[in-house]
Amino acid sequence: DQGDTPYNLRNCAYMEDFFKPKITWGNLNLKGTYSYVQKGMFINAPSPFIVTSNIAILHILNSKIADYYIRSLGVTRNGGYFEYKPMFVEKFPIPQTGLDSLELYPINPSKEQEKEIDDIIYQLYHLSMQEIEYIENRES
């Protein structure tokens, strides 16, 4: 799309979103890795993002179940790389209740906390032990 002048190639209707807190990720990765960008901070490279300050969503997207689900929507490329397109990430269902306990964890949890977070998320999605074992033991 083109802006108001030949020098303004884009009149960005969502410009204010760049100033808001957001979750961002690299498009091409070996596994889904999402990062939190605080209000007023900017992303230095082209990458998709979701405008939210909800840390629970960050933890859900970084979970094993989210990676499993999102990878099921696309194709893995050479070397095991997967393109985490926004249209795939947008399709992942986020529970509307039970997120409070996830917000208590830090933005960068320890390995032990990551395991606790995954356990909470498995409960949020009502996974059986068999489903949990499958996700935990699958090859990425």
Question: Where on the chain are the PLM-derived regions?
Answer:
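Non-catalytic DNA-recognition/assembly elements of restriction-modification systems
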Residues: I94-S140
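Polybasic, glycine- and aromatic-enriched phosphate-binding surface used to engage nucleic acids
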Residues: D1-D100, Q123
